[in-house]
Amino acid sequence: MSTFMAKKEALDRRWYVIDAAGKPLGKTAVAAATILRGKHRPEFTPHVDCGEFVIIINADKAVLTGKKLEQKYYCRHSGYIGGMKKIQYKNLMATKPEKAMELAVRRMLPDNTIGRKSMTRLKIYTGTEHKHEAQKPVAYNA
């Protein structure tokens, strides 16, 4: 008997909705990353993209515990001397709340082609409305 290997063509991709209102940012991001990667499926195969679609609503209402609202920074570097850019979490939430959720999920996925392909299946919205009702998404309790 040989080990089962999932084929990308044989997988059916379902849509899930995660409501981030009042939930910690990290726990919501973990649930989304697990679904995007496909690790919740019994036929998960590490080298095959078996993930599904995820819609995150109310991204602006995600919370952080402790003093992270004041102390958490997102950093990036241009590669040049003095090219460090830092933005405080509360400033990011004031301007682009969906970007904070996107960064949290992105950093939980692998840094390879499967991770980049998984990010294309992530849809983030600040309100309760989304434009994917035609796909009949299922509510996911994270």
Segments and roles (model prediction):
Residues 1-103, 109-113, 131-142:
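Ribosome large-subunit tunnel/peptidyl-transferase-proximal elements
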Residues 17-20, 121-125:
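Phosphate-binding beta-loop-alpha motif at adenosine-nucleotide cofactor sites
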Residues 115-118, 122, 128:
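C-terminal folded domains that constitute the principal catalytic or ligand-binding module
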